[in-house]
Every structure is written in structure tokens, then in C-alpha cells.
């Protein structure tokens, strides 16, 4: 039984890798043929537990998605959009970090008809909106907020919120956007003691340096020497 099980896992992995090439090339006709033969192909996965549906989201194939949506009588009938890979990431995590918020909006509009969990975390507690914040995807963050994502939820390892990740990864535009409607001023959320924790535990410095002073917020310039604190000054609201 173990040998048969290993063979089936290997065979499924090879099959999904072959379908991956089909998706990468954008061969919708071949994919339609495969889907008609086995509709559950979209939930098959490779060794990393990445499903065919995740691959469609990763490569941003909107035509493939629209084809799948037309085959279902109701959202989620066939496609399992909450299925996780080996790191606990779902298709929502991959959609959120892509630089294509229109693709995310399309999927949100479709699955949102019956209600969706947009704060679905991976094994580290990172939600899709945090993934979008790490990449600086402002429009994706706003789309997820519109569908009920919680920007104040914290991950399991670092205890970061969406806003904290935007600060830590240096995406000032996203920080400004979040400050306008969803957060308090910068100095009230990212005090100096957090910076000390970064240095001790992770040996990494945030790309946006924030002082404890209410009127001073500093953004580190990436083109400067990292050994010197060369900054440009912003006001306390990040404008």
C-alpha cells in the first residue's frame, strides 16, 4: 500500500507539473479538455501542495478563471479556494501578493457572493492582506479591506499587523493610505522599543525608521549607505 501511495503521489505531481506548463503557455483549449474529463483537476496538487487553481492564480490567467467560474452552479462547488500548500498559503495569498488587483477583484466578486474568509492565515499566521502589505500592493490591500479583511490582526511569529508589515518592508505609499482611514498616526503604533526587538531577534532593520517623537517620522533612503542613517523627513501622518 505504501508503494502504491508513493506512486500515486509521484504520478499526481508529474501530472500537475504538466498542467502547469499548459497554464504557463495559456493553452485554454487543452485545459478545457482536461477539465471536461476530470473537473476535480483544479484541486490536484504537486509535491509542494500547490493546486492547479493556485497555479492559475500565480500566473494570472483571467481567462482560465472565468472558464472555471462558468462551470460551477454556485461559488465553491468544485474549486476549493481555501486549500493550503505546504507553507499554509492558500490561493488568496498568491492573489494578494501579485501586482494585479483586477485579478483579485474578479475572484473576490465571484466567491464573495456566498461570503468568504479573507483573513485566512497560513501556518505563520500571515493573512492575504499581510502578504499584500509586504509587497506594497496598495490596491490589493484596499480590495481586501472592502471585503472585510482585518488590518489589525497579528501574525504568530513577529506579532505584526498589516500596517507593521507595510512599515517594516518600506512601502511608504501604503503606509500613508492606511493612515488616512484605518490607523492612528504613525508614532502611536511603531515605538522605538519595537525597533530594538527587530535588532535583537531578527538582525534586520525596518526600511522605515520611526522615532518616538510625535512630530517626526523618518523614511530611510534605500540609495544611501546602510551604515548611516540618511533619512528624509515626513510629518506624523506620513503625508
From Swiss-Prot:
ANK repeats lie at residues 48-77, 87-116, 124-153, 158-187. It holds the Pfam family Ank. Its main location: host cell. It comes from the Viruses. IkB-like protein that inhibits the binding of NF-kappa-B to DNA, thereby downregulating pro-inflammatory cytokine production. Forms a heterodimer with the NF-kappa-B subunit RELA/p65 and prevents the activation of the NF-kappa-B transcription factor. Inhibits calcineurin function, which is required for the induction of nuclear factor of activated T cells (NFAT)-dependent immune response genes. Prevents the binding of substrates to calcineurin without affecting the phosphatase activity. The C-terminal region contains the docking motifs PxIxITxC and FLCV, which are required and sufficient for binding to host calcineurin. This is IkB-like protein. The gene is A238L.
Amino acid at each position: 500500500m505504501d508503494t502504491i501511495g508513493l506512486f500515486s503521489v509521484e504520478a499526481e505531481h508529474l501530472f500537475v507539473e504538466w498542467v502547469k506548463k499548459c497554464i504557463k503557455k495559456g493553452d485554454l483549449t487543452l485545459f478545457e479538455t482536461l477539465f471536461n474529463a476530470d473537473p476535480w483537476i483544479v484541486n490536484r496538487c504537486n509535491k509542494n501542495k500547490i493546486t492547479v487553481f493556485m497555479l492559475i492564480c500565480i500566473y494570472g490567467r483571467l481567462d482560465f478563471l472565468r472558464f472555471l467560474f462558468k462551470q460551477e452552479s454556485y461559488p465553491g462547488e468544485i474549486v476549493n479556494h481555501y486549500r493550503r500548500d505546504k507553507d499554509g498559503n492558500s490561493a488568496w495569498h498568491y492573489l494578494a501578493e501579485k501586482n494585479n488587483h483586477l485579478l483579485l477583484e474578479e475572484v473576490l466578486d465571484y466567491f464573495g457572493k456566498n461570503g468568504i474568509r479573507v483573513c485566512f492565515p497560513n501556518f505563520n499566521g500571515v493573512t492575504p492582506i499581510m502578504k499584500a502589505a509586504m509587497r506594497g500592493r496598495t490596491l490589493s490591500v484596499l480590495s481586501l479591506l472592502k471585503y472585510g479583511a482585518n488590518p489589525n490582526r497579528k501574525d504568530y511569529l513577529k506579532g505584526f499587523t498589516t500596517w507593521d508589515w507595510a512599515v517594516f518592508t518600506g512601502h511608504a505609499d501604503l503606509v500613508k493610505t492606511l493612515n488616512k482611514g484605518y490607523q492612528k498616526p504613525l508614532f502611536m503604533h511603531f515605538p522605538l522599543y519595537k525597533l530594538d526587538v527587530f535588532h535583537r531577534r531578527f538582525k534586520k532593520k525596518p526600511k522605515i525608521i520611526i522615532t518616538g517623537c510625535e512630530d517626526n517620522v523618518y523614511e530611510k533612503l534605500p540609495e544611501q549607505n546602510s551604515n548611516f542613517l540618511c533619512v528624509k523627513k515626513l510629518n506624523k501622518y506620513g503625508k
